[in-house]
Amino acid sequence: EDDTLYQAQVNKVDYILKKLHLEEGMSLLDIGCGWGFLLIEAARKYKIHGTGITLSHEQYAEFQKRIKDQGLEDYLTVELMDYRDLPKSGYQFDRVVSVGMLEHVGRDNYQLFLDCVEKILKPGGLFLLHFISALKEHPGDPWVKKYIFPGGTVPSLREILNHMAEDNF
């Protein structure tokens, strides 16, 4: 309640990392890794081997700098990659996380996104998907679609659960 916005973000990442049940040496993929905070925390606290993917050249460059500045080159990598290219990458991960990225995928691509995750998740692996949800399926507010999630939408929990069932998540 009295936390700063920064502390609330730190708390959210800590909570997500606990939910992933990470163990030293595990592999973790962050789809839409942003500036790398989640993976940096995971590497520091759990000694995992993490990969982040992003479409942003600015985030890619800054995350690479942070990896080097914090001496985490043996633990972390970041790639400029679209999630749709993951299946042909040959990668396999113990854990996959995506925080606040699904909204940008767009309703027509939810199943493709989940199919891509299913193909790179090791048997017995764990996938944590964090997204903003709506109560019902709807096309969305034009302003939000233009300025917040261009090309995307806010999904309902029901539609994501239905898509997840297709991949046995």
Please provide the spans of the model-predicted regions.
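Conserved beta-strand signature within the Rossmann-like core of class I S-adenosyl-L-methionine
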Residues: 124-132
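Short, glycine-/aromatic-enriched active-site segment of Class I SAM-dependent methyltransferases
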Residues: 133-151
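A short glycine-rich, Lys/Arg-flanked "PGG" loop and its adjoining helix->strand segment in the class I
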Residues: 111-124
